[in-house]
């Protein structure tokens, strides 16, 4: 599933080609995504100038003059730029054609993504209750420490809770906990302030570095320019169960937490 770095990589890839451009038409070949694409999307978006492309959590916000398109890549979705009129392949469900001659093409083999229209995206039910951005000033270790008091849930699902902080998905939660030396099974409320301060810094560092590397390509993800991400070459724990720890040589173990596979080093993480 594309996580925050993959979505931010997509945003950075498509924004220069969309911002300031006017939409000529919208072609929808398949409306049945996680939520149906609005039947009047072509009417609402055609003729409008795109003002900016932003990101909130794992959502892309394409802001036009009279509203915004909320995009989510789901499990296997991607957005890339193609020339208008390029024949669509299977699973290429939507083209947003621009007067520049380029089109933003949405591809989603599993159809778990979304393209929704609204006037004010930050008040939309999908975004209104989200926590702070992990790379912003409102997120730090003190927030993690205070919100964790009295919590018996494991620390990994705790930091993946979008009400606590957005955008820390399975890949980057696994990597941040490894870097901070924290066992993902530990009760959130049992972890000290000092360790949460370290964990928050590792979350920020790893997410920022993953964005620089273009995200993590594990299955279907490519950026807005069609290129894969390269952070998977630097993974220490995620997807490496049964392999040797790159730090101490111990065999990495896997455990299920909140229905997610969690890989950890029993020696490095306590």
Curated annotation (Swiss-Prot):
Assembly information from the UniProt record: Monomer.
InterPro entries (alphabetical): DNA_glyclase/AP_lyase_DNA-bd (IPR015886), DNA_glyclase_Znf_dom_DNA_BS (IPR015887), Formamido-pyr_DNA_Glyclase (IPR020629), FPG_cat (IPR012319), MutM-like_N-ter (IPR035937), Ribosomal_uS13-like_H2TH (IPR010979), Znf_DNA_glyclase/AP_lyase (IPR000214), Znf_FPG/IleRS (IPR010663)
Disulfide-linked positions: none
Keyword Repeat found: no
Cofactor: Zn(2+)
Any one biological process term the GO annotation gives: base-excision repair
Cofactor binding remark: Binds 1 zinc ion per subunit.
PROSITE patterns assigned to the protein according to its UniProt record, in alphabetical order: FPG_CAT, ZF_FPG_1, ZF_FPG_2
Recorded catalytic activity of this chain's protein: Hydrolysis of DNA containing ring-opened 7-methylguanine residues, releasing 2,6-diamino-4-hydroxy-5-(N-methyl)formamidopyrimidine; 2'-deoxyribonucleotide-(2'-deoxyribose 5'-phosphate)-2'-deoxyribonucleotide-DNA = a 3'-end 2'-deoxyribonucleotide-(2,3-dehydro-2,3-deoxyribose 5'-phosphate)-DNA + a 5'-end 5'-phospho-2'-deoxyribonucleoside-DNA + H(+)
Pfam families: Fapy_DNA_glyco, H2TH, zf-FPG_IleRS
Family according to the record: Belongs to the FPG family.
Gene: mutM
Signal peptide: none
Any one GO molecular-function label of the UniProt entry: damaged DNA binding
Acetylation is among the record's keywords: no
Chain ranges of zinc fingers (FPG-type): 236-270
Keywords: DNA damage, DNA repair, DNA-binding, Glycosidase, Hydrolase, Lyase, Metal-binding, Multifunctional enzyme, Zinc, Zinc-finger
Role this protein plays: Involved in base excision repair of DNA damaged by oxidation or by mutagenic agents. Acts as a DNA glycosylase that recognizes and removes damaged bases. Has a preference for oxidized purines, such as 7,8-dihydro-8-oxoguanine (8-oxoG). Has AP (apurinic/apyrimidinic) lyase activity and introduces nicks in the DNA strand. Cleaves the DNA backbone by beta-delta elimination to generate a single-strand break at the site of the removed base with both 3'- and 5'-phosphates.
Residues annotated as catalytic: 2 (schiff-base intermediate with dna), 3 (proton donor), 58 (proton donor), 260 (proton donor)
EC number(s) given by UniProt: 3.2.2.23, 4.2.99.18
UniProt-recorded name of the protein: Formamidopyrimidine-DNA glycosylase
Binding site for DNA: 91, 110, 151
